[in-house]
Amino acid sequence: MVNFSSVFERIKRLDVQYNKPTKEIRGRDTILPITLTSIFIFFMWGLAYGLLDIMNYHVKVAMGIGRQKAAILAAGYYSAYIPGALLIGGPLVKKAGYRIAMTTGLGVLALGNEFMSIGASRCSLAGMVAAHFVIGLGVSTLERSANPYAVNCGPRRQAALRILMAQAWAGIGTVVAPFLANAFVFDPDTSTARPDPDPLHPGRCQMPTMKTASCSNLGTVITFYRALGACIFALMIFVAVLFFRTNWFPEVEVPISAPVDCGWKKWKHPLVSRRFARIWWGVAANFVNLGCQVTFAQFFIEHMKVNACASDRWAAYYMSLAQTAFVIGRFAAAGLVTMPRIFKPRYVLMCFMAGAVATTAAGTDITATAAIAVAIMVMFFEAPSFPMIFESATASFEEWTPTCETMMIVSISGGALQPALMGQLVESVRISHAWWLTASCFLIVFTYPAATNLIPSFRRALDKAEIGPEAVDHGGADEENGLQRSSTSKENFAVRIVEKVTFRRKKSDETGSTTP
């Protein structure tokens, strides 16, 4: 049996930072590691996420399968977040650190892409679902390690800014994905064909008709994933050299919680208490939130084809525009949280989520150019939700922070549920009215930022983490200093009164003694 502890120990000995004392990471020290991690790690899983929706649509058309079977591909990907975070990413971070976990995640992601090419070459839906599961294992391991690394690599008060900037690079990966699919996957002879108008619903087009299965159309998928897997494997080697043979990426200490033995009485576990209500609320909100984001992305192309009468190629371009708005949304939120005393992160998150609810509801009954514009606005407003929920839900839990981070990554598995429900709704009430499901779910997500602004204990914990304890305590310090000044002035006033009374008594006594 392989002794993983000894394997990790040997890997750590190759690290130039091995057995060296850790230094305090200041704000300017985080620029290089966060920038490079964003480019090499966050961008890569953003690319994988963006390709998931585009490629799944192509596989659905090529194999002639319905929405329910196509949803299984996404379910295979997102269901992997549960074992990926609990059995791979979480233990790796605790045992070996963030950098080894990120390197391992890249390796698993490369392996999953190679499996995808094998499944496509055999025209096997089950094989491609299994490959999506392996890809999900790799991406969940990356997210379990890279997100906390961005949050914890530097002063806590800048955590929201760091993770928003890093996650913006994941958004850039999703922008690049449709262009890659257009260039290497879509058939140029059919991708420019516009759907037929719907005679019963003016301004809309008919649902894309089911085409005859033709596995020969998967040839480009085979080549694409094979090449992508090779590129990711090469990137893994390059990143490993940067991680372990340079001092550019400081190893961030992972706090370890004390073991808790509560037997079968799980309700006595410390996590099951009012102190951790915020993380549980955040997990539930993010579970629903990822379902909304995945559903919107998966049905975006069909939404464009039906309500904007766009061809496959133009629908992919519109998706690129929407993903660009997604990136702009994250950069906009990052710009706002650079001024936390004015734009507190909890305010920013609440405003963006309110915009997501409003625009999704507005897009339920519009067509043509308006449908395109509103869909793009939805992507803009939903952009900062995951990184900001992740950062705020895991703040100020000290030794329980790694466990809370694992819980947040597990919540991404919500992306496996809502798309299946959306597929059934589309079959029943058409895609326009089915968006009410997503709007309602965004409203559920909105309750989390509302709670962080309305519940006093949530507000205090987040302000202490995001603005700094000295800023939160500043009011108390001023009050204490004011009380001290007040008491001092009162004492001085009393002394002056006593002195005046004593002086007058002495003067009256002297006057009385001189009177005959």
Regions found by a protein language model. Give the residues of each.
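Intracellular juxtamembrane helix-capping segments at the cytosolic ends
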Residues: 140-155, 383-398
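Extracytoplasmic
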Residues: 33-63, 142, 146-147, 177-178, ...
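Conserved MFS/SLC helix-loop-helix module at the cytosolic interface between two early adjacent transmembrane helices
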Residues: 83-126
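Cytosolic juxtamembrane N-terminal segment immediately preceding the first transmembrane helix
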Residues: 1-45, 61, 269-274
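C-terminal ends and interior cores of transmembrane alpha-helices
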Residues: 46, 107-122, 354-367, 450
